[in-house]
Amino acid sequence: MESSCVSVHTEEAGMGKEITFEIPYIRLRFLTELLADARMPETKTAALRGGMGEMMLRQNCVMDRNCGKCFFHKACIVRNAFYTRMEKKPAYVTGDESVGYLIECTDPCTEFQKGSIFEFTMTLFGDSIAFFNIYLQAICHLGMNGLGKDRARFRILEVRNSGISSDQRGTVVRGNTVNIEEYRIGMLSDHIRKRKEKLQASNGAWSIKFLTPLSMKYRQEYMTEFWAEALVKGAARRVQMLDYYIGTEAEIPEFSAYPEIRAQDVRRSSVKRYSGTQDSHMTLRGIKGKAVFGSMPDECLDYLIAGELIHIGRNTSFGFGKYVLGREGSRDPEL
């Protein structure tokens, strides 16, 4: 059944507030060139995020990285761009959350030769869109210093718009030239509408495939299999957090039904990362796999489509929670 993507009222639940998909975003694809033969970790998102944060601190921190006692914490570029400070937060958010940006890299290659092309994607939301030059400079300096423990050095060739719409195209950066006129900002609501049109034009059972690990609790336990209620509510929470980030104190709606999972194939997955701020190694754990649905309530579909772009669960800033929706018998899209 066709339906438009609209804001969802929660007055029936007694909350009187509205969750909205009117969230600005921009999706950018970075094309880089390796400057020498190099090794990289199989999972690169955590290294990219950590390296970018380190470069931001080196370039901008004026108080010896003592954030807890910093006089300039409200004006801090790193805090605003890297941790995406929110004036108000949902009750379940207790610490700093990196909700304003996502970095994606699903290239599993570990051996790169000089001149090889290395790609990754960055998606910015809300106020983070205005910090593009901060992210760009950090990634540029990361390329000069080297990525990962083997210091893989690279240079940025291009940064391209990579939105779903034909008008979200164009090259923002080529070499040393920034063409900000090609910086094409979209709205999450438009992304949902166009993805829904494509998905509903196909037949077959609905499916969800996690390309990176999902770390999420259901009934106070970390999931070892997929639960439809958890997936839908997880996507709704991410939309809610982005609403708060843009200044809208939205409430999660009450869903009358959830998709029915007909079959699933799940495996456990983990990612090792090094925390420079804590000077320690840690392992992030989750599950990957695919689930096929026997039903797909339309009230849930907008949120699950949004989740494709914004990711769900814990550790999304380290690349977790990326998935694609599909229809069985049709080709899964590349997002």
Q: What name fits each language-model region?
A:
Residues 2-335:
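RNA-interacting cores
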